[in-house]
Amino acid sequence: HLFESRFDAMRAAYKGVWEPILASGSTVSISLLILLFSQLSSTASLGPIGAIGIVCSMITILTLLPALLLLFGRWIFWPRKPEFDGDDHVMSGTWSKVGRVIEKNPRRAWIISGTFLLLLASAAPTLKADGIGTIDTFTGNPESVVGQKLLETHFPGGQGDPTQIVVAADKIDAVTAAVKNAPGVTEVSPLLDGFVIPGQPLPKVKIVDNKAIINVTLNKAPDSVEAGEDIPKIRELARSADSTALVGGTSAVYFDVRTANGRDNRTIIPISLFVITLILGLLLRSILSAVLLLGTVILSFFATLGVCALVFNHIFGFAGGDNGFPLFAFIFLVALGIDYNIFLMTRVREESQKMGTRPGVIKGLTVTGAVITSA
């Protein structure tokens, strides 16, 4: 609308967008790369893959897209092709009205929105994201789930998939005696070198490289959170009898994965917050503004967890969720939320330098509101 020449329009637009695009892309890329600190290869590998994708997107947006827009001209915006008239049309529309409402009652606006988000965030602690068994991942009752429930009804839950302890051959009896009374244990027996045939002598214990395996049957489903809670005590007792004992099997693997996810939540999230604060501080030239913006995004993150808790746990009644969910939700929600803040605040700063803080904020909101909403 403001420029008759599409080249002049592109020059003005490019000057205004390259900095926030680089800043937002860098923020998301660095946030994803922080996943490399994860103890799980499945999580760590996602970091560089996602970061490479973001960098490629930035290159495309800053090079290929402008070239295509210049090549094809205004008709590419059909059916609402912009025509040159010299007027600034951005101060009209829905977001202009929203901006005027906020301008009239700024205190009421932030109190209402902040209170609403806090109410949603208050439900976040009720979110069940401490792990979930395989049978609980189904919303229906397939044959495998029916079979597992039948097994748990008539036999120990871990009958078909025992926990295994690798021990020194001369420590079999000591370890067996140590773990047989552990919580959740229903049966302990060494792995035999052959099949048990009625009326025939029992096969010898299978020993390989002076190591033997002891099968420990638990009374709960092997992939359940409850079975995993028994693993630390079993490990403690086994190692009290054999310091080289190693406890493995499905229950142990699931427990270790949940432990690693918990550690990732406690380390990666704070590192991400620190890095994002630095990037925002450099972009906005103000650490206070960066902390304020980060606070709004963190509040929206906890509000999102609260909504998830209300919907998944209290409305649909799901058994729970993977304990890696909070980390992935944080990385993507906070990274995207910071993106939107960068788009908004970059334009607000630009407009504030021209027309003052208050009208600059309203102009920035009006210009970026539709873009943020559609994104």
Predicted regions and their residues:
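Structured non-transmembrane domains adjacent to transmembrane bundles in polytopic membrane proteins
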Residues: 129-320, 342
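Membrane-embedded transmembrane helical bundles of large multi-pass transporters/channels
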Residues: 1-129, 240-375
